[in-house]
């Protein structure tokens, strides 16, 4: 197995992008859930 710096760099970039995408997804989910929770509490109180 030979060492190819550009291949390693592209794998690292893909890995970082995957982590960033997951982080954005979790953040969006958390914001959506908190907004839905606030709306639901207001709605249930009447």
From Swiss-Prot:
Gene3D superfamilies: 1.20.5.80. The keyword Transmembrane applies. The keyword Glycoprotein does not apply. One of its GO terms (cellular component) is helical viral capsid. Keywords: Capsid protein, Formylation, Helical capsid protein, Host membrane, Membrane, Transmembrane, Transmembrane helix, Virion. It is found in: Virion; Host membrane. Disulfide bonds: none annotated. The modification N-formylmethionine is found at residue 1. Residues 1-17 are periplasmic. Self assembles to form a helical capsid wrapping up the viral genomic DNA. The capsid displays a filamentous structure with a length of 760-1950 nm and a width of 6-8 nm. The virion assembly and budding take place at the host inner membrane. This is Capsid protein G8P. It comes from Thermus phage PH75. The gene is VIII.
């Amino acid at each position: 197995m030979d060492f190819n710096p550009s291949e390693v760099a592209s794998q690292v970039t893909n890995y970082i992008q995957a982590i960033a995408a997951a982080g954005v997804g979790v953040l969006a989910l958390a914001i959506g859930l908190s907004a839905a929770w606030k709306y639901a509490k207001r709605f249930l109180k009447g």
